[in-house]
């Protein structure tokens, strides 16, 4: 075994003496070994795809079609179902074979990536510059770096267009807003108006505005992917064909660690945005698969008891609650008729099971008396008992049952994990940006290894 004191295992430019990094500093040792760094990245991609395939098959093996996905702790099958695979009206799973195929495809792909990663890490050339100049690079080569950036942008654009093609031509995607409680449909009438799509970016992120997270129809989502895909592809071509302008050469730090920090910063933003998207948005993340949003579960409870008490003879339009406000219905600050009780805070919720009961001025009393359909009652009762909550204090009036089934909503899992990961990536961004800027400014980075405690300790073996 190689330790700091036992240098018998030569690592060809990958030991602490030549790189300044010990083995546990990972890819930092490979900063200037493009071939070995390629191996590390391909192997990492293999691990990611292996997880996707294995977890996918694990979820398929444990899936019970009679129960909703969100009751089974699934996070991958909901994504496949949202893309329209294996589901029918109301989000009912009618065929699990596409999910099995997805798992196997990812597993096979991971084997190819794993082989490539091991090959480049152990057998392939240490550096690519001599043998394969097209794939070689030097971190300071600004033109080459923007070419690599361009290639990445084109790949991202192609990915965006894959979703467009699936939605428009290849079977469509699941639309939670389809009449009668959701269905798979082709998205034909795409929104391509820049004023609508870029208007989302100009919205406030707070309250009912909700920035891009307020998108509530698939036409806007898929049309937005047409724009994003086009921007990424044209931007990629631009970056391949051009060299950085003088202001860009001056503004950025051009080193491997700087690029790492930029990437971590971008991924941090993605993580925080994904957190908000999966928590609040029930169009991109349909409640049939991910469970209701918090506001949705709260409003569903108010609706469920309105239905019950109306059947028992209550006058839902005039009954007063304990505060003197309407017990079942009240008016919002702007005059709309909304659900009464603690759920008033969520009065601007929009959900497919509730919208048919609205009129021009909020909830329509006549529709609530005459038009409620059985599927709306069933769905709201289901959502009421599956709130994505675990709170010590008030939860918007939702009756949380501590002795109930062991249930954690996929929305809770996905929102929490992406917030935590987004935060860690942000810290990593600050850390690596600080190191990269220090190195560029020419002063010492990191801690002085001469006084590092581990150097005075006895070797492990």
Swiss-Prot record:
Binding site for [CaMn4O5] cluster: 355
InterPro entries xref list: PS_antenna-like, PS_II_antenna-like_sf, PSII_PsbC, PSII_PsbC_sf
Superkingdom: Eukaryota
Gene Ontology CC, one term: chloroplast thylakoid membrane
Record Gene3D superfamilies: photosystem ii from thermosynechococcus elongatus
Topology term for the membrane: Multi-pass membrane protein
Family affiliation: Belongs to the PsbB/PsbC family. PsbC subfamily.
Stated name of the protein: Photosystem II CP43 reaction center protein
Species in which this protein is naturally found: Psilotum nudum (Whisk fern)
